[in-house]
């Protein structure tokens, strides 16, 4: 008897190795039929289920089915069910799969559908689409296919009804997405609760916790047989039934599914390629194992390779996952015989190295190396991190830099004498060679012309037979072939002829030092001595005479000075062109600089920024002592500020001046000693080496680019050069040391550097050759690299001498100070105390209320004891000056948590508990039990003693949120100045502390994730490679964090104490190497010296500018505006107080254009909460800035009636004050607040204490969802400004709109605005209809048009620009209208606008022609103004009047 249909299905599950055979969804499942198409090898499986499978299960089953029959046929699946009701969640879950399956042949519709999702309501399936075009195309081409695809997967028949949301289609789509995400989160929470219940009986009052990680190594599924072949990932190119791979995990993520199960996804690499791996959990044990899988571990994985429809890539579906031990590279040398790496680049070497000093030093420490150096290109920005890792690991850090050094000037003439230059006979010569090395390469052509007064007297042109065939590269560069030189005269013959040719003449050439090197080497080889005649180099001569030229190549100069050069890179043509140029140059030099004699030339070799034109060479510089570190900081600063040209440069004389306490090494192949040895020979290298303290040689692979370019002929020549470098050190008795020039950690990291260098294109010379192997080598690897020197010598260079250099450097050098060094302000402590106590007594009476007395003493004790008085006094001076100059200052951050800041005039926010105080008799009454959240919410009340209306104040903010519980945290006083006033405030710091003591806070910009991903894609394109998505992720990860540029904090000002200088803390530079910048910045990222030197944040903000504009327009003092005005408060619930309806302004509140409360997101919050007073607005401000605070937290609590806007957690300080009001200890309350605001949750023991204090469960649950929170003082300051502005909006509307459009608006549609509300509404509709396709400029304009529409609906008008009245930038009030400024005209910039006004003030414009000429207005703008009747009173041209 055959198998039943149900049994056939069971057999099918076994055949495809499906892991979830017992899933309840398979109950009664059966095989209805299998239709086999033999010719096309396609099998259709017709299956029966009770209902459509949960999507996650369907995906897993479908993939297993496809893989199970991969080698037999292509499989399709059709499902039948008795299902009659629609399941909304299932339809949504399947949506993406269905769309990709059904309409992949119409990409536009496919993309449009993937951006939305269907909804089911009362059995009707609807779909929001963006526009009518999409709707029509769906009906014509797609809906039937989509509906049919659903039915083939077991869904009942249904129709999809598309519709267009006319008001905000894109917003609707986003809302749908958010709804589904919320549903996912809710299901995930239920799943977590179920897991908790099954695993252990815990206290019901506690929140469900995630499954705890399992003990021991990871093992999911079975142990993978060690005999099973591990496949390299690069060899997997298609789907496979089963593979075993092993690799390093670099990304891991666990996702809760709606089914209650978990999906583990991780990315793994074996460094040949990478894969994404997926595994669905089957039970809580597996989920405990999932929690153990983290980035950084090594795993072995077995499972099928399948094309994943979601990821659109090959993915491994793991059956078995085993943690394995990976044996990394080890330094096998004895512990007392390890090397020290003295040449290491970190991520601070701009776009050139891929590992941080932390990673490099940690590896060195792990290998047992006693020390490691940091030597980045031209900067020391890794020093703070280097110091930190040295402190943690105990490894000795050697602080250095690979500098770009230049000779101060290149000689204009060699072998100078006192001969006259005029009327001399000159021999201008040029050589063509087989390469760049005078030692290893040969001259193959020597050409010269003898000239006098610009006329050619005689020519010399000889080929030289080098004795070997010419390389293809030589022929390509010189156009000289082997046949041309074969049989020519010998070098000795030609050189002797040339020597005779030059007698009695002055010699010259272009870049002649190169040619002289070959000639002198050849002369000496044949015992002719060196060239004795004066030799003029036209290259530095041209640079001196014409410093502003962009290039000085011979062809460039010939073109500029109209000198014929027919065959560049042929010696005879080059020589004659150079001769004609020399004649012109010498005449110019005499006329401009009175250069008449040969020895006059070198008097000018350092002029006209000669350092810019010298070719930089690399020098390794180490700080040997603390004094040396300061000198190094000075050199870095000078190189960035005084001598920057393309790269930071250090002139040799400057290096010599600051050499005390420094050790100098010869660096890499770009060092002058190695270059001299390679190109000019031992003697010249010897002379240059005398300048250095130690000689560096590097592994042969480091020099591979020189071999590739044929600069060094072969490995034999390279070994000769390196042996001579060693010999040179021995002769000079200088230490010769083997260094690695490390740019990355391990060999497989080299590709990250290739990607970074590739991203810079042809501009980077490193792109012209293959990159050498410059990983961090172990002692034994390094010894092996230098084995050609012999075992003893290799050990000396690699181990003995590297340790010797390290020992010569002091052990206790500190690049970062160990404490704070605030600036000095005489009497600061006393002044802050006096100001505080005096104001306190003025406000609260004498004696002070105990509460006020205690709070002030608490704060002043911390401030004075920890040396923070000067911080406060600087802030007080800045605020006082700004206020005096007519600009209010808003505080940011937590400074409003300090009553000392309030009483000394730094902030308007009062952190004391809500209270009344009488301004007449100083009667006070405080509310300390949480009765009120803000003093601004208190009802108006007269003093019970004297009858004066009392001041209402206090926001109940603990001081601890500012300076920490112990009051010793360095204060970060952030102040919001008007954007107009910010530069004045910045420069005032120079007035207070002196020009040399004030700097901008520097920043370092590194490669971000998205940028790195772009680099990877570019690398794929340029190298014609294609990587899997997981491999792209790995490569992008490897390229992130590398320094790209530098910048400056927009507000941070660093202040140096007057008894120190900036070099005690950091070098300085210009931001982004911009030599025209107004301020120098710290070279170190300011975060790294935050605890050592004072930084003031003097920010620019629109709110104070707006307040000043409102005050100027109205004459009303903004500080007199009440904070509880009923009309103003009504704005936050309805626009009625403005005299308009919701429909008229398309908003349910009246807060359009109000800072903090005008965005769509916050207006939605207002609609949900209907705030009635200041403290509730303060809550809104906190909720809108936090993360994990509003969405799926406070919003739900309010909607469900569990809490109100008044008592949900809005700001971080609420937590501390709330818990104290519940009766908890203040220190524990503070610690809980700190944990929660940083997203760290609440430890179990603290949760116990919260339960004991009867803190509600909803409150604790809310805390556990929070990731980041806003400071209450910050929110209080922002709301204060917002309410002042709102007051003008309600009661002085035209003043408000005038200020808003003048201060906060940059984008206008002045035509629509001047044509009235219908035109404005039409323009708004046009932008809204574009949805996400609207440009950023259009989205900004939409915000402005919303305000314009509101103003028009309130009965006011806009007027087009008025040529006689309009301001350049500000809108003007004219009756019930606003006149547009000139900058509102499209395409008319602010500079032209100012020019128009300035010209008009001189005299009225007579005509359009006059406007164009004096106003600098283009014809396009004239046409616009004409079309819009702005110029109706002006004729086209000026007209003369006879009478």
UniProtKB/Swiss-Prot annotation:
InterPro entries: DNA_pol3_alpha_NTPase_dom, DNA_pol3_finger, DNA_PolC-like_N_II, DNA_PolC-type_N_I, DnaE2/DnaE/PolC, DNAPol_HHH, DnaQ, Exonuclease_RNaseT/DNA_pol3. It comes from the Bacteria. One of its GO terms (molecular function) is 3'-5' exonuclease activity. Keywords: Cytoplasm, DNA replication, DNA-directed DNA polymerase, Exonuclease, Hydrolase, Nuclease, Nucleotidyltransferase, Transferase. Gene3D superfamilies: 1.10.150.870, 3.30.1900.20, 6.10.140.1510, Metal-dependent hydrolases (3.20.20.140), Nucleic acid-binding proteins (2.40.50.140), PolC, middle finger domain (1.10.150.700), Ribonuclease H-like superfamily/Ribonuclease H (3.30.420.10). GO terms for cellular component: cytoplasm. Its EC number is 2.7.7.7. It is an enzyme of class 2 (transferase). It holds the Pfam family HHH_6. Residues 426-582 form the Exonuclease domain. SUPFAM superfamilies: Nucleic acid-binding proteins, Ribonuclease H-like. Belongs to the DNA polymerase type-C family. PolC subfamily. This is DNA polymerase III PolC-type. The gene is polC.
């Amino acid at each position: 008897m055959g198998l039943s249909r149900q049994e056939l299905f069971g057999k099918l599950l076994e055949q495809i190795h499906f892991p979830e055979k017992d899933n309840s969804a398979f109950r009664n499942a059966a095989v209805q039929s299998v239709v086999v198409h033999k010719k096309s090898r396609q099998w259709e499986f017709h299956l029966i289920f009770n209902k459509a499978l949960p999507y996650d299960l369907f995906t897993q089953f479908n993939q297993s089915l496809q893989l199970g029959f991969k080698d037999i046929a292509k499989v399709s699946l059709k499902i039948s069910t008795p299902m009659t009701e629609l399941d909304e969640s299932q339809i949504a879950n399947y949506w993406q799969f269905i769309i990709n399956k059904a309409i992949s042949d119409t990409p536009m519709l496919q993309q449009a559908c993937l951006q939305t999702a269907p909804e089911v309501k009362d059995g009707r399936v609807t779909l929001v689409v963006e526009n009518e075009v999409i709707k029509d195309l769906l009906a014509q081409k797609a809906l039937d296919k989509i509906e049919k695809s659903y039915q083939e997967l077991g869904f009942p028949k249904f129709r999809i009804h598309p519709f267009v949301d006319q008001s905000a289609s894109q917003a609707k789509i986003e809302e749908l997405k958010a709804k589904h995400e919320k549903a996912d989160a809710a299901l995930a929470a239920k799943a977590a609760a179920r897991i908790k219940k099954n695993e252990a009986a815990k206290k019901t009052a506690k929140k469900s916790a995630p499954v705890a990680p399992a003990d021991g190594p990871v093992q999911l599924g079975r142990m993978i047989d060690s005999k099973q072949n591990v496949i390299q990932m690069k060899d997997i190119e298609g789907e496979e039934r089963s593979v075993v791979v092993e690799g390093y995990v670099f990304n891991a993520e666990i996702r809760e599914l709606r089914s209650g199960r978990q999906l583990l996804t991780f990315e793994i690499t074996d460094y040949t390629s990478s894969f994404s791996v997926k595994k669905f959990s089957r039970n809580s044990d597996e989920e405990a194992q999932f929690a153990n899988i983290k980035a950084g571990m090594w795993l072995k994985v077995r499972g099928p390779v399948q094309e994943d429809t979601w990821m659109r890539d090959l993915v491994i579906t793991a059956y078995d996952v085993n943690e394995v031990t990976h044996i990394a590279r080890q330094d096998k040398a004895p512990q007392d015989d390890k090397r020290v790496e003295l040449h290491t680049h970190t991520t601070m070497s701009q776009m050139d190295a891929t590992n941080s000093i932390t990673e490099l030093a940690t590896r060195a420490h792990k290998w047992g190396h006693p020390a490691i150096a940091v030597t980045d290109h031209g900067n020391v920005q890794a020093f703070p991190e280097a110091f930190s890792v040295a402190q943690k690991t105990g490894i000795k850090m050697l602080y250095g830099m690979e500098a770009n050094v230049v000779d101060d000037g290149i000689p204009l003439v060699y072998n100078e004498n006192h001969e006259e230059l005029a009327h001399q006979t000159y021999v201008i010569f040029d050589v063509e060679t087989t390469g760049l090395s005078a030692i290893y390469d040969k001259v193959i052509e020597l050409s010269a012309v003898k000239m006098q007064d610009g006329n050619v007297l005689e020519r010399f042109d000889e080929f030289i037979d080098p004795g070997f065939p010419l390389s293809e590269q030589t022929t390509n560069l010189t156009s000289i072939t082997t046949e041309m030189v074969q049989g020519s005269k010998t070098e000795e013959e030609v050189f002797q002829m040339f020597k005779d040719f030059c007698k009695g003449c002055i010699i010259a050439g272009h870049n002649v030092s190169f040619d002289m090197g070959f000639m002198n080497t050849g002369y000496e080889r044949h015992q002719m001595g060196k060239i004795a005649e004066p030799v003029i180099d036209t290259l530095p001569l041209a640079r001196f005479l014409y410093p502003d030229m962009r290039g000085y190549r011979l062809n460039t100069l010939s073109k500029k000075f109209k000198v014929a050069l027919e065959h560049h890179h042929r010696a005879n043509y080059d020589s004659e062109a150079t001769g004609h140029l020399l004649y012109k140059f010498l005449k110019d030099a005499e006329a401009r600089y009175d250069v008449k004699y040969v020895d006059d030339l070198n008097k000018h070799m350092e002029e006209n920024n000669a350092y810019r034109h010298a070719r930089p060479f690399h020098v390794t510089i180490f700080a040997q002592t603390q004094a040396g570190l300061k000198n190094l900081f000075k050199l870095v600063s000078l190189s960035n500020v005084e001598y920057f040209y393309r790269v930071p440069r250090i002139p040799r004389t400057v290096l010599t001046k600051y050499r005390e306490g420094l050790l100098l090494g010869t660096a890499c192949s770009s060092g002058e000693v190695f270059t001299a040895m390679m190109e000019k020979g031992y003697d010249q290298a010897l002379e240059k080496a005398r300048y250095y303290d130690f000689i560096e040689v590097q592994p042969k692979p480091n020099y591979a680019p020189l071999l590739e370019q044929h600069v060094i002929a072969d490995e034999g020549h390279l070994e000769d050069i390196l042996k001579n470098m060693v010999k040179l050190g021995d002769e000079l008795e200088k230490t010769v040391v083997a260094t690695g020039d490390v740019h990355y950690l391990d060999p497989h990291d080299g590709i990250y550097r290739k990607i970074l260098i590739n991203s810079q294109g042809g501009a980077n010379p490193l792109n012209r050759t293959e990159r050498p192997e410059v990983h961090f080598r172990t002692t034994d690897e390094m010894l092996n690299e230098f084995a050609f020197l012999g075992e003893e010598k290799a050990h000396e260079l690699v181990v003995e001498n590297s340790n010797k250099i390290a020992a010569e450097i002091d052990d206790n050098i500190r690049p970062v100070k160990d404490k704070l060094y605030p600036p000095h302000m005489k009497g600061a402590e006393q002044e802050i105390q006096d100001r505080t106590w005096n104001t306190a007594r003025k406000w609260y009476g004498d004696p002070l209320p105990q509460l006020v007395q205690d709070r002030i003493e608490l704060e002043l004790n911390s401030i004075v004891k920890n040396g923070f008085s000067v911080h406060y006094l600087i802030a007080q001076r800045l605020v006082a000056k700004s206020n005096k100059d007519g600009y209010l200052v808003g505080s940011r951050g937590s400074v409003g948590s300090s009553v000392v800041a309030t009483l000394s005039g730094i902030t308007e926010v009062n952190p004391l508990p809500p209270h009344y105080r009488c301004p007449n008799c100083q009667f006070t009454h405080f509310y300390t039990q949480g009765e009120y959240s803000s003093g601004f919410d208190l009802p108006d009340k007269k003093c019970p003693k004297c009858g004066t209306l009392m001041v209402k104040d206090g926001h109940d903010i603990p001081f601890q949120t500012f300076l920490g519980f112990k009051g010793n945290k360095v204060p970060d006083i952030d102040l919001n100045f008007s954007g107009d006033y910010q530069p004045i405030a910045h420069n005032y710091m120079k007035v207070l502390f002196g020009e040399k003591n004030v700097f901008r806070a520097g920043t370092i910009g590194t490669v971000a994730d998205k940028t790195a991903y772009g680099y990877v894609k570019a690398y794929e394109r340029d190298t014609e490679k294609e990587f899997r998505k997981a491999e792209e992720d790995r490569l992008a990860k490897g390229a992130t964090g590398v320094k790209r540029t530098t910048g400056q904090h927009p507000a941070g000002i660093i202040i140096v104490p007057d008894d120190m200088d900036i070099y005690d803390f950091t070098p300085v530079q210009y931001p982004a190497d911009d030599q025209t910048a107004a301020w120098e910045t710290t070279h170190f990222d300011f975060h790294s010296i935050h605890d050592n030197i004072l930084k003031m944040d003097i920010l620019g903000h629109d709110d104070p500018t707006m307040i000043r504009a409102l005050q100027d327009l109205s004459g009303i003092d903004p500080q007199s505006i009440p904070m509880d005005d009923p009309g103003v408060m009504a704005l936050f619930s309805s626009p009625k107080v403005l005299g308009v309806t919701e429909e008229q302004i398309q908003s349910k509140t009246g807060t359009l254009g109000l800072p903090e409360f005008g965005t769509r997101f916050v207006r939605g919050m207002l609609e949900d909460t209907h705030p009635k007073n200041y403290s509730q607005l303060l809550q809104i401000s906190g909720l809108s800035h936090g993360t994990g605070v509003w969405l799926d937290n406070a919003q739900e609590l309010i909607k469900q009636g569990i809490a109100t806007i008044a008592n949900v957690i809005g700001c971080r300080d609420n937590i501390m004050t709330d818990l104290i009001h519940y009766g908890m200890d203040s220190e524990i309350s503070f610690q809980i607040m700190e944990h929660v605001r940083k997203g760290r949750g609440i430890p179990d023991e603290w949760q116990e204490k919260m339960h004991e204090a009867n803190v509600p469960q909803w409150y604790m649950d809310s805390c556990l969802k929070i990731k980041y929170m806003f400071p209450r003082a910050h929110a209080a300051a922002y709301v204060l400004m917002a309410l002042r502005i709102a007051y003008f909006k309600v009661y002085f509307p035209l003043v408000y709109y005038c200020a808003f459009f003048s201060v906060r608006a940059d984008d206008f549609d002045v035509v629509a605005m001047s044509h009235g509300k219908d035109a404005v509404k039409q323009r708004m509709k046009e932008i809204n209809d574009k949805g996400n396709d609207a440009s950023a400029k259009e989205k900004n304009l939409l915000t402005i048009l919303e305000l314009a529409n509101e103003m028009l609906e309130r009965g006011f008008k806009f007027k087009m620009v008025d040529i006689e009245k309009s301001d350049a930038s500000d809108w003007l009030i004219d009756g019930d209208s606003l006149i547009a400024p000139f900058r509102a005209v499209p395409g008319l910039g602010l500079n032209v606008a100012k020019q128009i006004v300035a010209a008009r003030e001189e005299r009225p414009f007579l005509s359009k022609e006059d406007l164009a000429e004096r106003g600098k207005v283009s014809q396009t703008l004239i046409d616009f103004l004409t079309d819009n009747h702005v110029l109706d009173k002006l004729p086209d041209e000026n007209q003369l009047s006879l009478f």
